[in-house]
Amino acid sequence: MAKFLTEILDEINSDVKKINDYKTDNALRFIFEYAFDEDKKMDLPDGEPPYKQDTAPLGMTPANLRMETKKFYVYNRKDLKPIRKEQLFIGLLEALHPDEAKLMIAIKDQKLHKLYPKITRKLLEGTGFIKEKTKDA
């Protein structure tokens, strides 16, 4: 069974060399792109929205972040009203384990480095997870 993304991020944060073990992990790539690429910042208000945390143990919640990464684009769709995006986001948070919900909020706010200080833009650019930031002319 695949590791939960929070477990992988904890592992990488403990030993940054472990990031090379996950170069083919698309869910991790999505997380890093949305957490660090300004063009992919989710069109949602910053901060933690009001939501009811799921009390189920990790792996027993209705959703898991690995499966939900494919749907991140929804939070940037221009055809959805802001209130609908917020409703969808809150619904996701309520379906995730509290650790994954906390991670999802950090991704949305592009503050992953606050949860995992050793996972930096420089590390991700150096390992090819995200594109290098280019300076505008």
Where are these regions (language model features)?
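N-terminal nucleic-acid-engaging modules of covalent nucleotidyltransferase systems
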Residues: 1-137
